[in-house]
Amino acid sequence: MLTGADRIAADGSVANKVGTYGLAVLASHHKVPFVVVAPMSTVDPDTPDGAAIIVEHRPADEVTRIAGKPVAPAGTSAYNPAFDVTPPGLLTAIVTERGVARPVNAGTLRVLSAGSCNAEGPPADVYVER
């Protein structure tokens, strides 16, 4: 399964449209690879992990009204996040224009961000395809 990302934290956590996390859980349960495809500009090394990603909350009436008509009782509140966050443990890989980070973790993303590997190759716990 392929998906995009609006933001990727330094540890590989991915913020994307609501529903991405649920799809990743299902893919993991059914042993289907779950791959994020996004440009390197999406990776934010200053955001350490998924908990640090600020998730925008949309107006409640986006889900309590349809075409201007109420679909919930008056005064009903609604939790309406614009994104959800998928932890790196549910991802098979992150594909960027610089290569493929697999497994998804801070080490593989650092190697991709650096743009090159040393002559001996990446450390043993880091695997990056170019």
Residue ranges and their predicted role:
Residues 1-130:
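Conserved phosphate- and dinucleotide-binding cores of soluble alpha/beta proteins
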